[in-house]
Amino acid sequence: MQIVEQMKDKALAELNLVKDKKTLDDIRVKYLGKKGELTEMMKLIATLPNDEKPKLGQAVNIAKQALQEAINLKLANFEEQELNEKLAQEKIDITLSGVGQNQGSLHPVTKTLNRIEAFFKQNGFAIEFGPEIESDYYNFETLNIPSHHPARAMHDTFYIDETHVLRTHTSGVQIRTMEKQQPPIRIIAPGRVYRCDSDITHTPMFHQVEGLLVDKDVSFADLKGLLHAFLNSFFEKDLKVRFRPSYFPFTEPSAEADIECVMCDGKGCRVCKHTGWLEVLGCGMVHPKVLKAGNIDSEKYQGFAFGMGVERLSMLRYGIDDLRMFFENDLRFLKQF
């Protein structure tokens, strides 16, 4: 038994001097391998008297267990050390400046459309869409625009053929909605529209949002209240709003809504032409002939409609002075939004 204890102490002493995994494995083989010294001691059990066999077997097992635990602990220390060295070599220097990433954003026109749609959806309006190539019937006839009306002139409209045009407004969506749905009706119709015009304030294609509400006992006061609330929400300030009498063939009475200039707070500047007011949208009570074209009883129901140019509202909200910048794909401009 004393020999086993001495062998264990010797092995543990050698383990304390080990500096690498290879030497550690050599010691393991030397004492615990198939021909290791402690393994050979087990073979001596057969030569001992019966009363001595259990004592030697127990002593050898205790020695082997102690040695194995010491080897495992040493091995774990080596592996932890190797891992720490590897992590130190692969460490990322977080003090270095990061690599810049280009981050996309929504186009200002899209942002404006989303803002308009959000307000009207919150107020119970549905969103309806229609074809961009529109028939003469829906683009003009049903909107009380007869064949001799100036809006039909070639300099205003892109004609596809004698009976189809690139729509000049989204008002045709209103008629299509009235044909398939009885009041109450609350819709807005956003989309692209086309007109033969191109300068600093006009482009051949632009975006428009038109709205329609048809129900019983609808008045111009309802229209004014809704649009005033919309303009305050869109520009995020309490604006002065005025409604000027105007003319549109599809509404009667008709008006244009002006807001106090957001650039100069009504004091007068180049943007508002020193009037202190900016025109932002057109509106009015739906003409009885238009209701009739949509199969709505004008004696029973009334309605109001309104329309606004999305690019114009974008220009006013973001302080943009040239409409054409929206369509030039200049990243220096677009990155500002």
UniProtKB/Swiss-Prot annotation:
Record-level GO BP terms: phenylalanyl-tRNA aminoacylation
UniProt keyword Aminoacyl-tRNA synthetase, yes or no: yes
Catalyzed reactions: tRNA(Phe) + L-phenylalanine + ATP = L-phenylalanyl-tRNA(Phe) + AMP + diphosphate + H(+)
GO cellular component labels: cytoplasm
UniProt: Mg(2+) binding residues: 252
EC number: 6.1.1.20
GO molecular function, one term: magnesium ion binding
Entry-linked InterPro entries: aa-tRNA-synth_II, aa-tRNA-synth_II/BPL/LPL, Phe-tRNA-synth_IIc_asu, Phe-tRNA_ligase_II_N, Phe_tRNA_ligase_alpha1_bac, Phenylalanyl-tRNA_Synthase, tRNA-bd_arm
Cofactors that this protein relies on: Mg(2+)
UniProt-annotated location(s): Cytoplasm
Pfam families: Phe_tRNA-synt_N, tRNA-synt_2d
Enzyme class: ligase
Keywords: Aminoacyl-tRNA synthetase, ATP-binding, Cytoplasm, Ligase, Magnesium, Metal-binding, Nucleotide-binding, Protein biosynthesis
Main location: cytoplasm
Details of cofactor binding: Binds 2 magnesium ions per tetramer.
Family listed: Belongs to the class-II aminoacyl-tRNA synthetase family. Phe-tRNA synthetase alpha subunit type 1 subfamily.
PANTHER family to which the protein is assigned, alphabetical: PHENYLALANINE--TRNA LIGASE, MITOCHONDRIAL, PHENYLALANYL-TRNA SYNTHETASE
Binding partners and assembly: Tetramer of two alpha and two beta subunits.
Protein name: Phenylalanine--tRNA ligase alpha subunit
Gene source species: Francisella tularensis subsp. tularensis (strain SCHU S4 / Schu 4)
Lineage, highest ranks first: Bacteria, Pseudomonadati, Pseudomonadota, Gammaproteobacteria, Thiotrichales
Primary gene name: pheS
